[in-house]
């Protein structure tokens, strides 16, 4: 039996503890020994089990599984979109908030075209989202995070901020056909709960969790948008469609919202 083990080691080039039993399917003990070695190196990696559970999935499900487990602090859409504008923030999410918002300011001054990426970035990150609103439209700052984008579209005051919304429609990806405000409705819910409370300055008493929280901005938007009716009509229909989706995702737990954003992003 000693000779057999030596032979096995020479043939397989595997360093394994003797004695080896030779079965029809190779060295069972060898494979176990090797596995225990690899497991000992993996102990520090808490993602190993998650990784294995992901292996059972396919396609988008697998991708989502990886994204959930390998970026535990942030929805994956944020990780991806951070890379689109400033790659340096991909690695660290928490620092990403700071450098992201700085990156936005410099990009904003460079070109309006890159603002689409900004709006995509900030769909996932709540704090910079608030900053972007206050930088982008000063007069709308206190209206709440969701509404300024609707206002920009319906009032059409600033070409800059309007372009922000329009290109946000594409990069956000919640629905290619929707007008800007619609997509902001679909994409923002994740940030809504915090951002609304931070930026509202007491102007909107509604709680963002309740359907009423969305009702307020719509009514205001419609009354403001009366000046340019065609745009209002165009905006209004998808708004109602998205509104129900938005309410669903708001009323459910944050993980569902993250999933919804991953789907759209």
UniProtKB/Swiss-Prot annotation:
Sequence repeats lie at residues 75-94, 105-124, 128-147, 148-167, 217-236, 238-257. Glycans are attached at residue 228. First expressed in the vegetal plate and progressively the expression becomes restricted to a subset of endodermal cells as development proceeds. It comes from the Eukaryota. Residues 112-125, 133-144, 152-169, 194-212, 222-243, 250-265 have a biased composition (Acidic residues). Keywords: Cell adhesion, Developmental protein, Gastrulation, Glycoprotein, Repeat. The keyword Glycoprotein applies. Residues 73-92 have a biased composition (Polar residues). A motif (Cell attachment site) lies at residues 25-27. GO terms for biological process: cell adhesion; gastrulation. Residues 75-257 are annotated as: 6 X approximate repeats. Residues 71-265 are annotated as: Disordered. May be an adhesion molecule involved in gastrulation of the sea urchin embryo. This is Protein ENDO16. The lineage of its organism: Eukaryota, Metazoa, Echinodermata, Eleutherozoa, Echinozoa. The gene is ENDO16.
């Amino acid at each position: 039996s000693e000779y057999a083990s030596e032979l096995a080691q020479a043939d397989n080039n595997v360093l394994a503890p003797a004695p080896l039993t030779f079965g029809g399917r190779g060295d069972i003990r060898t494979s176990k020994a090797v596995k225990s070695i690899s497991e000992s190196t993996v102990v520090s990696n808490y993602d190993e089990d998650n990784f294995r559970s992901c292996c059972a999935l396919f396609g988008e499900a697998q991708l989502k599984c990886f994204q959930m487990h390998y970026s535990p602090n942030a929805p994956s859409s944020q990780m991806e979109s951070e890379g689109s504008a400033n790659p340096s923030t991909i690695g660290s999410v928490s620092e990403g908030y700071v450098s992201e918002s700085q990156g936005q300011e410099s990009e904003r001054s460079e070109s309006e075209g890159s603002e689409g990426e900004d709006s995509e970035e900030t769909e996932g990150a709540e704090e910079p989202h608030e900053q972007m609103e206050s930088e982008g439209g000063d007069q709308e700052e206190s209206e709440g995070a969701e509404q300024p984008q609707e206002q920009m579209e319906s009032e059409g005051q600033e070409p800059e901020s309007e372009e922000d919304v329009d290109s946000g429609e594409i990069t956000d990806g919640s629905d290619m056909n929707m007008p800007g405000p619609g997509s902001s409705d679909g994409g923002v819910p994740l940030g809504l709960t915090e951002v609304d409370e931070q930026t509202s300055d007491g102007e909107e008493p509604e709680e963002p969790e309740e359907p009423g929280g969305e009702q307020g901005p719509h009514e205001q938007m419609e009354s403001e948008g009366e000046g340019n009716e065609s745009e209002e009509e165009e905006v209004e229909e998808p708004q109602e469609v998205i509104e129900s989706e938005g309410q669903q995702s708001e009323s459910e737990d944050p993980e569902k919202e993250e999933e919804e954003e991953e789907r759209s992003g």
